[in-house]
Amino acid sequence: MNYYRINEDSMYFVDFPGYGYAKVSKTQRAVWGKMVEKYLSERDTLKLVLLIVDLRHSPTSNDKMMFDWLKHYDLPMCVVATKADKIPKTRWQKHIKTMKQELGVLPGDNFIPFSSEIGLGKDELWGLIDGYIRPSENESPDSEDAEMIANESQQEESTEA
């Protein structure tokens, strides 16, 4: 697993590189699979899973398994269909429809066609991520956040005096 710190608010992206593509033994792949399952099912701080798929091709059996597993455990997820720039724009809708059908994406499920080359989907994806990581108005901050807010308030009061 690779951890990428995104900002000072302790937001991290965790990457499971090539869970379906690594050239390793079936035994090693099974060990990785259990590690990924354990990580995803036991992370209280998990906000959103981005399932990265290649829009040029049908989803792999691993893509389908992961999608089904995430749905089964009701984990917040977004399918990010990358490499849209590698497909003629006139064929995007066909590829999107095929990908959604083969994965079993339902209306209301998060699905974003994406291209880092042309910026397609970038703003939509960051907006979605932002919506998952920021507490809603109805949500109270957890105890760690509450403590941090209290400390900041005390510091502001002491600097004003």
Identify the function of each model-found stretch.
Residues 144-161:
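Long, low-complexity, intrinsically disordered segments
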